């Protein structure tokens, strides 16, 4: 077994991470078969520069390491966003020092079509309904109003601005910070409950 194969041996989390279905999307655990799509989309500087941890350039090896790492982490939920059986992005709830953090990105060809909002709503429903978190946090670069709109449409409330390191630009940048509490989420659930696919 090669080193690459060893890294992926325990990588399937289909038995741990549920499959979530929305009107147009399916969210499921990352798989080795997603490596090329993830590498292709994440290698776009517009994506990397708007996330904290994606390097630029981003290659196949980066995608392999990402999938191996997220599938080994306990207590986190990472999903590949699927449209018509093809990966179009990633969303996750990561356990951070200041609370569970929602993160997401979509391949550029899928921007502006409501997919991010749809995926994040499903992720939020899972985080509050299944993982039983009390609060979620998230952030968007101040230069990324589209991501800010996604968070606001999902009920997140702005809490301030702070500097955060952006790996792709090798520097810190101002980030709008957001928070969503369980009570507000419960009052906004008119967007409909996500279906859990077993």
Question: PLM features: residue spans?
Answer:
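Short loop/turn motifs at secondary-structure junctions and domain boundaries
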Residues: 69-75
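Acyl-donor (CoA/ACP) binding surface of acyl/acetyltransferases
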Residues: 1-49, 78-198
């Amino acid at each position: 077994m090669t080193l690459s194969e060893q890294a992926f041996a325990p990588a399937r989390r289909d038995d741990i991470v549920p499959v979530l279905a929305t009107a147009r999307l399916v969210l499921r655990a990352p798989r080795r078969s997603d490596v090329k799509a993830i590498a292709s989309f994440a290698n776009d500087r517009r994506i990397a520069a708007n996330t904290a941890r994606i390097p630029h350039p981003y290659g196949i090896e980066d995608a392999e390491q990402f999938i191996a790492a997220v599938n080994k982490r306990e207590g986190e939920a990472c999903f590949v966003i699927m449209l018509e059986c093809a990966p179009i992005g990633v969303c996750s709830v990561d356990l951070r020092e200041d609370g569970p953090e929602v993160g997401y990105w979509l391949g550029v060809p899928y921007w502006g079509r409501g997919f991010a909002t749809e995926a994040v709503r499903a992720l939020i429903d899972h985080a509050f309904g299944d993982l039983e978190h009390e609060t979620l946090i998230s952030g968007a670069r101040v230069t990324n109003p589209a991501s800010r709109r996604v968070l606001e449409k999902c009920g997140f409330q702005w809490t301030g601005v702070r500097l955060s390191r952006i790996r792709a630009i090798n520097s810190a940048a101002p980030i709008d910070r957001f928070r969503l509490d369980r009570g507000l989420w419960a009052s906004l659930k008119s967007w409909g409950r996500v279906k859990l696919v077993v």
